């Protein structure tokens, strides 16, 4: 659970400062961890996108 929360915070922060966060991530997290973060980011991005699309389709 704690790991998931940390990843979520990292994703939200990375959106604000991509350049600064990328450097921090490379130093703080090893390469394998970065791959996991990217995968989680894609999964999280896809879920909200699908929900928004469904809502938009339902409104009209």
Swiss-Prot record:
GO biological process terms held by the UniProt record: symbiont-mediated suppression of host innate immune response
Task: Tell me where on the tree of life, at the top rank, the source sits.
Answer: Viruses
Q: Which InterPro entries match?
A: Gemini_C4 (IPR002488)
Question: Keywords for this entry?
Answer: Host-virus interaction, Inhibition of host innate immune response by virus, Suppressor of RNA silencing, Viral immunoevasion
Which Pfam families does this one have?
A: Gemini_C4
Q: Does the entry feature the keyword Membrane, yes or no?
A: no
* Keyword hit for Cytoplasm: no
The family classification in the record reads: Belongs to the geminiviridae protein AC4/C4 family.
Reported function: Pathogenicity determinant. May act as a suppressor of RNA-mediated gene silencing, also known as post-transcriptional gene silencing (PTGS), a mechanism of plant viral defense that limits the accumulation of viral RNAs.
Q: What is this protein called?
A: Protein AC4
């Amino acid at each position: 659970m704690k790991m998931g929360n940390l990843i979520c915070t990292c994703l939200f922060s990375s959106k604000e400062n991509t350049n600064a966060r990328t450097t921090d991530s490379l130093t703080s997290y090893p390469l394998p961890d970065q791959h996991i973060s990217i995968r989680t980011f894609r999964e999280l991005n896809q879920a909200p996108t699908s929900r928004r699309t469904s809502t938009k389709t339902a409104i009209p």
